[in-house]
Amino acid sequence: MLTLGVNIDHVATIRQARRTVEPDPLAAAVLAELGGADGITVHLREDRRHIQDRDVRLLRQTVRTHLNLEMAPTEEMISIALDIKPDYVTLVPEKREEVTTEGGIDLVSNFTRFAQVVDQLQGAGIPVSWFIDADPAQIEAASKTGAKFIELHTGKYAEALNEESRAQELESLKKGCEQALSLGLRVNAGHGLTYWNVYPVACLPGMEELNIGHSIISRAVLIGIDKAVREMKLAMRGQV
């Protein structure tokens, strides 16, 4: 059954805007789980613009579903992951000047080093997911690194300017999902998904989990996190 991972980064974004102690991402995680979240996702960025190290450590102790740690494949982040041991890690590209992650990681150009990263993390019992575009070469490379999962980048689908472009991007995601499954990879997806565009992605055969943050937190500002999560789960079933 398709599951929902709720990204709570932007709860921390609001907190860090004033460098204060609230709103607390831990409280947000609890409410998200009460609302039906199947997992909690946080991105510990190198610049610490929202989620902080302390948040990840406390979430590791309090999350009752599963904790997905998004991070760049750097030595610093690998060391943190090996210490905290999240339920799994999603490795993403990162640029300091970007507002949010802009695309999938390039495994083809950095294959040897990234395969070693997978060995390090999975050797310590931490399953690895690669955040990649629905590109056949990248999916093939992800499989060859030995990773357990991929997360397909849905940004191009979400940002498509017309229905024709959106249909083309959805077809690319469908083919990417099929290829990944044929290679023995488990498939997640995320980036830019909202209440209004999530259902077609949720219908893709073999899709395991959708990771969604900004849309849920934006809605939660108005109606509360638990209700916003419930509504997203309805949207994933085409009931919104």
Swiss-Prot record:
Q: Where does 1-deoxy-D-xylulose 5-phosphate bind?
A: 9-10, 45, 50, 100
InterPro entries named among the record's database cross-references:
Aldolase_TIM, PyrdxlP_synth_PdxJ, Pyridoxine-5'_phos_synth
Q: Which residues bind 3-amino-2-oxopropyl phosphate?
A: 7, 18, 192, 213-214
Top-rank EC class of the record's enzyme: transferase
Under Pfam families, the record lists: PdxJ (PF03740)
Q: Which keywords has UniProt assigned to this entry?
A: Cytoplasm, Pyridoxine biosynthesis, Transferase
Where located? Cytoplasm
Catalytic activity reads:
3-amino-2-oxopropyl phosphate + 1-deoxy-D-xylulose 5-phosphate = pyridoxine 5'-phosphate + phosphate + 2 H2O + H(+)
Q: What is its main location?
A: cytoplasm
Q: Which GO terms describe its cellular component?
A: cytosol
EC numbers for this chain: 2.6.99.2
- Where does this protein act, in terms of pathway? Cofactor biosynthesis; pyridoxine 5'-phosphate biosynthesis; pyridoxine 5'-phosphate from D-erythrose 4-phosphate: step 5/5
Please tell me whether the keyword Ubl conjugation is annotated for this protein. no
The alphabetized list of GO BP terms reads:
pyridoxine biosynthetic process
Superkingdom is Bacteria
Q: Catalytic residues per the record?
A: 43 (proton acceptor), 70 (proton acceptor), 191 (proton donor)
Task: State how it assembles.
Answer: Homooctamer; tetramer of dimers.
In which family does this protein belong, per the annotation? Belongs to the PNP synthase family.
* Function field: Catalyzes the complicated ring closure reaction between the two acyclic compounds 1-deoxy-D-xylulose-5-phosphate (DXP) and 3-amino-2-oxopropyl phosphate (1-amino-acetone-3-phosphate or AAP) to form pyridoxine 5'-phosphate (PNP) and inorganic phosphate.
Q: What is this protein called?
A: Pyridoxine 5'-phosphate synthase
- Origin species: Gloeothece citriformis (strain PCC 7424)
Which gene name belongs to this protein?
pdxJ
